[in-house]
Each structure stands twice: as structure tokens, then as C-alpha cells.
From Swiss-Prot:
Belongs to the HAM1 NTPase family. The keyword Hydrolase applies. It catalyses: XTP + H2O = XMP + diphosphate + H(+); dITP + H2O = dIMP + diphosphate + H(+); ITP + H2O = IMP + diphosphate + H(+). Its cofactor is Mg(2+). The active site is at 71 (proton acceptor). It comes from Haemophilus ducreyi (strain 35000HP / ATCC 700724). It comes from the Bacteria. The keyword Hydrolase applies. Binds 1 Mg(2+) ion per subunit. Homodimer. PANTHER family: INOSINE TRIPHOSPHATE PYROPHOSPHATASE, INOSINE TRIPHOSPHATE PYROPHOSPHATASE/HAM1 PROTEIN. This is dITP/XTP pyrophosphatase. One of its GO terms (biological process) is purine nucleoside triphosphate catabolic process. One of its GO terms (cellular component) is cytosol. The lineage of its organism: Bacteria, Pseudomonadati, Pseudomonadota, Gammaproteobacteria, Pasteurellales.
């Protein structure tokens, strides 16, 4: 089978691991942007869509390949949707998962049980080329709640704090195969596949 090469526009190793197998099953030969020596551009957009488009356009421009990018985050009801767009740098340092979780726990300290609802949101964008005027855009959401302490060793980001009621565990307590089937990113990838 002739597989289409596509650059995965993320520097997040957790996202690469989570997305590459799924995209490969869709018939793509996935090449992480790190293999080209690229890092993601600054996320200056005001929405998940804008940030995903920025990343995909940059990766496509720099590699000459079609690109796929994800922008995702955790939106907590009691925090008016925060950390939201700033999930990866919530504590002020890019991709410091431990610091981000600590800050979230500190901000949620006085939020009572029953008012700790949250959702993971993923926006995935696919471009055929840098100036593609009709990008494919897909969304996925997973609903849960924020625990008072971390549980589980798997995953990344806020997974150890995100309790998923449908499985009665945190995302960090799921094995990678199970998470790839039910996560917000998995749901967005399935929605994207329907557009291909």
C-alpha cells in the first residue's frame, strides 16, 4: 500500500506516541516534526483551532509535506474554563506537567466535591499544504472531574488528576491501548477520519 507521508506538528512526546499509531492505521506514514529538527511555533492564537492551524501551517511550510496538528487542553468549570489554551504552560513553564498539576490542585483546593467538573478538548487540523484554504478540522471532548490527588502512572499532562466516570479511573490509570480508543484526542482523530 502506498502510504501518504504526513508531518505530525507537535513537540509533545506524549501526543506523538498517542497519535502516530492511529494515524498510521489511517494509511499515513507519520513523521514527527522533531525528525526535521523543528519545534512548534509560539501558540499565539485565541482558540484551539487557531493554534492547531498555526502549528500545522508552520510544519507544512518547513517540510513541504501535508501536516496534522493538535491543540488541546483541559477546561475546568470551576475555573471558568482554565487552564484551557494555556494548559501546557499553566504554571508559567512550557510542558512542565508536574508544575501544571500542582498549580491546578492549588487552585482547586477549596472547590467542593460535586463542583469539580472538567473536560479535555482536542482540536485536530489537517492541511494538504501550507496554504490549504480548506483544512480538515475535527474536535473531540471527554468529560470528567478533577480529583484532589494524583492517581496512576501512565499518560502525561493532567491525566493523573482527570477522573473519567465511564471507566471509573483516571486517564493515567488506563493503559495506552485503552486511552487511544477513548480519549478526547482519539475522538477527534475518529472525527477527522470521517472527513478523509
Amino acid at each position: 500500500m502506498n502510504r501518504t507521508k504526513i508531518v505530525l506538528a507537535t513537540s509533545n512526546k506524549g501526543k506523538v506516541k498517542e497519535m502516530a499509531d492511529v494515524l498510521s492505521a489511517f494509511g499515513f506514514e507519520v513523521i514527527a516534526q522533531s525528525e526535521f529538527g523543528l519545534v512548534s511555533p509560539p501558540e499565539t492564537g485565541l482558540t484551539f483551532v487557531e493554534n492547531a492551524l498555526l502549528k500545522a501551517r508552520y510544519a507544512s511550510k518547513m517540510t513541504g509535506l501535508p501536516a496534522i496538528a493538535d491543540d488541546s487542553g483541559l477546561a475546568v468549570d470551576a475555573l471558568a474554563g482554565a487552564p484551557g489554551l494555556y494548559s501546557a504552560r499553566y504554571a508559567g513553564i512550557e510542558d512542565d506537567d508536574t508544575a501544571n498539576r500542582r498549580k491546578l490542585l492549588a487552585e482547586m483546593q477549596n472547590v467542593p466535591d460535586g463542583q469539580r467538573a472538567a473536560k479535555f478538548v482536542s482540536c485536530i487540523v489537517m492541511l494538504k499544504h501550507e496554504t490549504d484554504p480548506t483544512p480538515k478540522i475535527a474536535f473531540g471532548e471527554c468529560f470528567g472531574e478533577i480529583l484532589r490527588e494524583e492517581r496512576g502512572q501512565n499518560g502525561f499532562g493532567y491525566d493523573a488528576l482527570f477522573f473519567y466516570p465511564a471507566k471509573q479511573c483516571t486517564f493515567a490509570e488506563l493503559d495506552s491501548t485503552e486511552k487511544k480508543q477513548i480519549s478526547h484526542r482519539a475522538l477527534a482523530l475518529v472525527a477527522l477520519q470521517k472527513q478523509l
